[in-house]
Amino acid sequence: MRTKHLLLLLFLIAFGTSAVAQEQDLSPWTDNPHGNEWIDYSKKYVRVGITQDGIYKIPLATLRSRLGNDLTGNNVQAWFRGKQIALQIDGDNVVFYGRKNDGVSDGLMFRPGPQARLDYTTSFFSEEGAHFFTIAKDSDPILRISSLSAVPASDGPATESFHIETVVKNNSAWLTAGANANRRVGIPFAHRAEFSIQSLNNSFYQRHNAFIKLLETDQVWDETIDLKDFVTGTGENVTLKFSIHGDGPGERNVEVFMAPEESQLTEIDKRFLSSNLSGLSAISDSRTVVPGTNITEAGKGFLRFRSTTTPNNSLTFRNRFGVSYYTVSFPQSLSFSEQSSKKYYFKAKGTGKSKLRITSISSGDKVYDISDKNSPVLLTGTLSGGNLDLEVNRVADKPLVLQVVSSSGITEPAAGVFYDVKFDLLYSFKTGDKIDNVKPEPADYDYLVITHNATGAKQVREGAVEFAKYRATPDGGEYNPLVISTRSIYDQFNYGEPSPVAIGRFVNYMIQSGIKTTHNVLLVGHGVGRIDNIIKEIPSDVPTFGDPGSDVLLVSGLSNDPASNIDVPSVPIGRISAFTNQQVLNYLAKVEEYERQTREESASNLSWRKKVLNLIGNKTSDEPQSFNTFVTSAENQIPTSTGPWDVSRVSNEAKLPPVGNFEREPAPIESYMNDGLGMLTYYGHGDYSGTIYNIGYASERFQQTSKRYPLVYITGCGVGDVYSSHSGLFVASDWIIAQDKGAIAMYANTFLAYTNTAAAYMKLLYAQIFQKTDATRRTVGGIQVNMARIFTGSSSNARVSATDQEIANVHQTSLFGDPALRILLTSDVPLPVSYIDFSGSVLDNANIQLQWETATEKDNDHFIVERSFDGKTFEMIGKVPSKGPSDLGGNRYNFLDASPKAGINYYRLKQVDKAASGGQAFGYSNIISVDFKVRSQNTLISVFPNPGSDKVLITSDRGDIIKSWKLYNSIGAVVSKGQETTVDISNLSSGIFILEVVTSNDIVTRKKIIKER
């Protein structure tokens, strides 16, 4: 836990995919919301992984052995990222243009959007581009590589003598040997957070996140530049592009030099950049390289990156920085000398033709126009004396890209990159067994179990299936479960590319028919988020989102969620972080026992569930007073009306220096655990190895012969970080998977927990748990969803705007255990209509949308929606018929109030039973309030140009007079203000700003402005 208090205003920005870096084509993801639109589930597919762009061949016999004897050269098809790609049948081989995984979908994990992914040369998770081969049906269109004569005309355009070559140097190569093969262990990542120096590290990636060549303040990185076949006098610039990243919270002045001679690397006229790089920021820039000044006329020179910041003794690590990549683009001659495969890039121009001469080429070499990578064209020209002359039609404003290959350059993929695709479900409640090659129907399932593909001792699939089978039984709640592997998810919903993004796309697909109150996602298996410890292709993980790990962000902001919010999980999600089947079964046995007790035991026998123990783990002598105050505030949320509750508190205050040694002092909780607790909370310090006031490993410490398992909430920094490595046992996972011991579920922080933030979260959590009855309390996963809505300010009853620490706390509070679990129940009495949630929100600045969920419905006929403007006198404004009773438990309802009044609107629901001999009975929900403020829609205020670099103009679409404006930076500080309609941003650093505009009628509008360099 960090005791530094930060009060920052955070403007919530809609993180979209509209502005992406030019190198990143996200259309397969933005055009296809789920990713499986291209699949014909009646076909067989074989996946072929390609790690380098180029021309490849596969024997038809190889494909036939996997797809069947019906495959011929006439009916073979292939797909890449949801698009059919053209093939060439060359004798007994299929020839195609193959592509590596460029990591473009990693951009979907960056904020404020994919444009923040500065190092576009690196994929975080994979190298393999997935190419799917299949047999076409008779009616299917077939794409083939066409041949085109490109013989030059005698009166054509002048011959072009060069293309633009780009040399790429990055610092993210996967290790190839040793114990860490296929990882990036030891390769610095900006920023891999350390508790000692980092005040905040978001789980989503940001501009500063990249693998780097790490430099201390007294170090330099020198590179030798040698531009092969450099052509001068073309009129085209040589361009250096680079990205520099801060790796600590300090300040540093970074410099970039380029010179013909190494001895000139300190000369001012050779310096491209001298700029302050503050904290965890990044500089992505380009410079024109001048032959004779920065390189020789032959294209040779030296490149240097350095910092001029004076080292500060032992704190030099605070000023660290690094270079993620650099590229040099330059005019290069059209020579194929000593090449087996070569790409030639010609810049975009208007319509017309390009006449080219490629030298040092032989008769067996082939030239493909790959400008459209999905549909290459085989070109033929005039070959004479080792020179190939071509005249190629140009597409207006599009680059021309050619791939030249020799016969040896057309390679056959290794056998290990082929595998037979199975769009399978490891389990479906519909059959009670596995189903191969099936399209999961969203309306059929609500309990989604995701596990990985590891085999042997590390496989946990059998345990995952057993868990799903239990949830399908009456005792388990009669859910409609499926079990699916990450491999199947990658293939169906992410074009075969491993990524955490795939899980969100799968869940988004599964909720397209509507989110049910019974929807849950259970991750079964370990997952690593620490970026330098991820295994290439993620073969044996159920991945988490980002680093620090966040399971919440896997399912947040899904487009099929009507209440979509990027910081709020669309459905409840939990994880069993197990390494073996037995560990999964250990937890299943605890869940079965916990729910058996609810069904079969008396309220008196379940009275232990009314016991709460609050542990306090202090670290310094000034903390007990404030920590006790925070815990008292949370305890005050426990009412007597839902009790009686038996609340105890234990602190390590007496063990603090100078009296004793607080480090890892065992917390005296054995008797509490053995007798039974409903909930155990730890408020205090911790790290990934445990809590300061040590609760220890449940598997080693407790007897718990009574099999009474508590819900556990831990605020200690990093105690929930089970995502850092593939080995070892973590406290958070041990308490879940320990046999007959530990917790029934746990909320725990995966990174930093700040005192104020943790205290506020704990207070709200206690309200969500203890102020609810057995009938109205949500599942542990549902509670987490509610907490996210309230804590981030995205529900009608929410707090004021959240700080970045508070939002990070939501992301980095993981739920370990089954999200469908209902806790603290002391009876199994059939429930009347009970509400899980009742909330309202302003919609389109004109309406108020009401939403409510019922946990159960019995003999319910309809709801009457009532509104009040004083909170006392209510009137009927609508009637909503019941959807129940539902086999799925409860239902979700919506109602639109199209005529709210400005100010506070109060609402309640009148639930009316079906008619009986004594007339219709009814009951009321709680009362909620929605503040309806008349505000303009963002579309009424326009800002142009945006992005911009100099001045931007404010206009009102309906002619309102601009009264005043303020411009805020990303931390809420005012950087400029005025009353005119022009905003000068020329002197501001590049980044994202919020413009707040007030018009003459006092309507306030906020617009996001992007400042470019």
Segments predicted by a language model, with ranges:
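Cysteine-dependent hydrolase recognition
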Residues: 22-828
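Bacterial Sec-dependent N-terminal signal peptides
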Residues: 1-25, 747, 798-800, 946
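Short, flexible loop/turn segments at beta-strand junctions in immunoglobulin-like
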Residues: 392-394, 897-901, 985-987
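Terminal processing/anchoring signals of secreted or surface-associated proteins
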Residues: 21, 326, 367, 471, ...
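Surface-exposed, proline-anchored Ser/Thr-rich loop/turn motifs
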Residues: 439, 832-857, 925-958, 967-973, ...
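Short, compositionally biased serine/threonine- and acidic-rich segments at solvent-exposed termini, linkers
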Residues: 412-416, 824-938
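Short, conserved beta-strand segments of beta-strand-rich sandwich/propeller modules, principally
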Residues: 300-302, 399-401, 849, 904-908, ...
